[in-house]
Regions:
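N-terminal amphipathic/basic-hydrophobic helices that include classical n-h-c signal peptides
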Residues: 1-18
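A ubiquitous short alpha-helical element
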Residues: 16-20, 88-92
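N-terminal intrinsically disordered, cationic/polar leader segments
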Residues: 23-33, 38-77, 84-85, 89, ...
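Positions in alpha-helical segments
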Residues: 35, 105-106
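A short interface-forming secondary-structure element
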Residues: 95-96
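Short Cys/His-based metal-binding microdomains
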Residues: 100-103
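Alpha-helical support elements that line or immediately flank enzyme active sites
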Residues: 106-114
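Glycine-rich phosphate/pyrophosphate-binding loops
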Residues: 113-130
Length: 161
């Protein structure tokens, strides 16, 4: 069976979204990820899929790996870079932990190139609906919730401008 979220069309992944293109909602993309990920019944294969998702992440420079961009409360070093251009939020991230980087890659894929309003209204619960929550520590789970809150708080601040 073709996995839509875990095996995106490379041609679509490379191009920039414009406001006239129809993109699935965050909830729909998240549901695809949950379905695709839950179809994989082997933890090592699930882990491999997460690692593959990190290949599409835009790099974070060493200069950007600073305290301002660092997520506190996460066991691993994790940096999130948020920007806003032409009405769209852009997300870049990096971590020294591959599992954290993989999970953040999913979060970034769901939120990147969205309007602040879309991001603010999203309910992200893929960690609870996949075996990922069982595979990561409570601290890492809370760290991922912090990432989601940071992105949504940033988006909320943009809607109040």
């Amino acid at each position: 069976m073709e996995r839509a979220f875990l095996n995106p069309n490379p041609a679509l992944a490379e191009r920039e979204y414009n406001m006239t293109e129809q993109r699935l909602s965050i909830a729909e993309e998240q549901a695809e990820f949950i379905d695709d990920f839950n179809e994989i019944d082997d933890w090592m294969m699930q882990y491999s899929c997460l690692l593959e998702l990190t290949a599409d992440m835009k790099p974070v420079s060493d200069e950007e790996k600073n305290e301002q961009n660092k997520i506190s409360g996460c066991q691993a070093d994790l940096w999130i870079i948020l920007s806003f251009e032409n009405g769209i939020v852009h997300i870049r991230a990096d971590s020294d932990s591959l599992i954290v980087k993989g999970i953040v890659a999913v979060i970034a894929a769901l939120f990147d190139k969205r309007t602040p309003q879309e991001i603010c209204g999203a309910h992200i619960d893929f960690l609870e609906k996949t075996p990922l929550k069982e595979q990561i520590s409570t601290d890492r789970f809370h760290g991922m919730q912090t990432v989601i809150r940071k992105i949504q708080d940033y988006s909320t601040s943009l809607t109040q401008m």
